[in-house]
């Protein structure tokens, strides 16, 4: 037909623990219509469009504009748009690259509407329509039937929706030929998901001070600790740390809950690092796994959507709030903790015990000797 195509995909950025190599040239490196990310993560977007067939001035392009609309929980990073042109659909045979300083396109942001418009300027359209670098001795001209790839990034914020209610992002391509009085449009979208946990801390005898209980949360899949900030009684993930000491210490609220939102679908370990005096600290970390699977189809883009499920210590749990939150309960029992085997404390207990036994034996022998003398 000679008309353009439009495909938009997303991935979690490599530096935000994305499951990809971070390639800037491989269009299949982790990109898909769906992705999972944590709050504070950077997500990479790419828009790929096959340009229409151009054979004359009449069939040349007079308009080629993208309007990208983010949901409330995702914000464009801004000033990072790059456009590349390729001879092939696989984006391996590059023709040229434009950045925002090239003058070939203009970018405009509307923060209130959370949109970004990318419009080809006159010089950009002129190059697309008339460049002589691709075709010789052909009826085609310019970048006819070539592939345009646009890349940019955004950040997942605390406003992101959790669970199977995703955070969609739609792009609309508006284009027109010089010999037409009407515009044509194409649409595509992709979806970002994020999740959370709700830890209920209890004492078996209903005693204990909840404020003395402390936890650390480790992402086992990415081998990092969670950093979060608290707002209105809820912790929102905002980053990660390599060292445990740099991670957030999670403390239950007055009702015993620790709610952490903005976690991607990964495996986690929840470790209790402190509890109230007179109670036994949890011996093992609680193992939490959040998984996703394809379920349903987007009415706009036709992509398979995701649904979440979870396990706690290997057992299936029913997620709440539309598969958004993993619920779990942690109980401390009265008692006291012995130092760990092989530690300094064990040696002190051993030496102390031997000393006490020696003293007792000495007292018994001394007592018997004293009675004998009498």
Language model: regions and residue ranges:
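Solvent-exposed loop/turn and edge beta-strand elements of beta-rich ligand-binding domains
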Residues: 1-374
């Amino acid at each position: 037909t000679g008309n353009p195509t439009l495909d938009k995909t997303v991935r979690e950025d490599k530096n935000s623990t994305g499951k990809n190599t971070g390639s800037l040239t491989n269009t299949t490196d982790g990109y898909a219509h769906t992705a999972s990310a944590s709050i504070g993560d950077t997500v990479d977007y790419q828009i790929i469009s096959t340009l229409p067939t151009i054979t004359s001035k009449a069939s040349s392009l007079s308009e080629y504009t993208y309007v990208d609309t983010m949901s409330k929980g995702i914000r464009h990073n801004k000033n990072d748009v790059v456009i590349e042109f390729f001879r092939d659909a696989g984006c391996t045979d590059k023709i040229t690259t434009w950045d925002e300083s090239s003058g070939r396109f203009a970018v405009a942001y509307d923060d209130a509407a959370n949109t970004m418009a990318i419009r080809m300027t006159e010089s950009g359209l002129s190059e697309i329509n008339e460049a002589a670098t691709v075709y010789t001795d052909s009826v085609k001209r310019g970048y006819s039937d070539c592939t345009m790839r646009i890349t940019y990034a955004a950040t997942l914020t605390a406003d992101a929706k959790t669970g199977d209610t995703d955070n969609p992002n739609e792009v609309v391509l508006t284009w027109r030929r010089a010999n037409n009085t009407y515009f044509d449009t194409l649409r595509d979208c992709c979806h970002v998901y994020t999740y959370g946990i709700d830890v209920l801390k209890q004492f078996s005898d209903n005693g204990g001070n909840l404020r003395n209980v402390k936890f650390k949360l480790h992402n086992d899949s990415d081998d990092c600790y969670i950093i979060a900030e608290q707002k209105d009684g809820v912790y929102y993930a905002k980053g990660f740390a390599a060292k445990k000491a740099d991670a957030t210490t999670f403390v239950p609220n007055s009702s015993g809950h620790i709610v952490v939102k903005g976690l991607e679908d990964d495996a986690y370990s929840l470790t209790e690092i402190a509890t109230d005096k007179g109670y036994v600290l949890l011996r093992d970390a609680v193992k939490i796994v959040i998984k996703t699977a394809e379920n349903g189809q987007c009415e706009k883009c036709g992509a398979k959507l995701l649904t979440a499920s979870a396990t706690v210590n290997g057992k299936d749990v029913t997620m709440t709030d539309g598969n958004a939150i993993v619920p779990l309960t942690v109980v401390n029992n009265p008692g006291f903790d012995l130092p760990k085997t092989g530690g300094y404390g064990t040696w002190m207990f051993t030496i102390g015990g031997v000393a006490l036994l020696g003293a007792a034996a000495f007292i018994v022998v001394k007592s018997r000797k004293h009675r004998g003398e009498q």
